[in-house]
Amino acid sequence: MKDINECIQQYLSAWHSRNDDNEYVSAGITGLSATEILQMFEHPALRLPEHKHAGVSLMVDLMAENDSMYFDAIYGAMYGREDIRGWLIPMMKEIDFIEFTPTQPSAVFTRASDTWTLDEWQMFAVFGDDRIPLPKGVSVRRYVDGFITQACDVYDTASMRQPGPDGSVADIPGVPVVNWVRDHSVPDHRIGMTDVSKLCTQFHPTESVYIDPVHGEFHGRDAIAAWLSTHLAGMQNVVREAVGPALTNGATSVQEWQHILVQPNGERTFLTRGTSVQRTDGQFITYAADYYDAASLPSA
């Protein structure tokens, strides 16, 4: 295990000495495990004013040079370290009034060929003493040989596409279209065929919460079951297709997916890209959250 304090100081020293934002910095970040990288991202030094923007540079420098993809729910997919750098760093500087606050503990999932991490967060627009809550989101990253090969940030962009008080609409692109690679190791699931009763027996009777970005929070098994019964009944022709492996570490599980509307004639219509998270107490599900972009849904 490396000394993360030493690693972060090496990186920050080199970062401050670089010639410009496009320069790759490797000091302190070579040969790290996914757990060590996660500790780097969470290091308090990155929150200090003198190191502003170092965190996003760190993430870019840890992307695999060529075989990497970063996905943002508004701007879509970028490929390769330098293309990701060319977009992400200027964008984060442009929106540096937005803070990302963790909402749940991060998690690590170790497999034979790769490692994945999970972060759940909420955005806040900060203007002086005012903190305006923005959508919650989730980041899922894949690591191979000390580099990030895939990073996907999923959140609901629908509210960001609505007219403001003055009637103006944010200058952002339409909902991105990505040809997601399906993970056939996870069976497709027809949402309308969900056995809600069986599913909900897995939730803690009282100390459980289910969170939907559009419909809100439901607390306790009975409330969760009542809402899911109604909600899922309206999704008879919707199929959930995995676009990532089923990840679990015993306490937390993650599944990345896309919803497809499959008509009786076989016609397929993309609905939304999402990520589901569940956390347990060892016996019951105590926390479940679905993250997806409602802006891509037909009724949005």
Predicted feature locations:
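C-terminal and inter-domain tail/linker signature
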Residues: 1-300
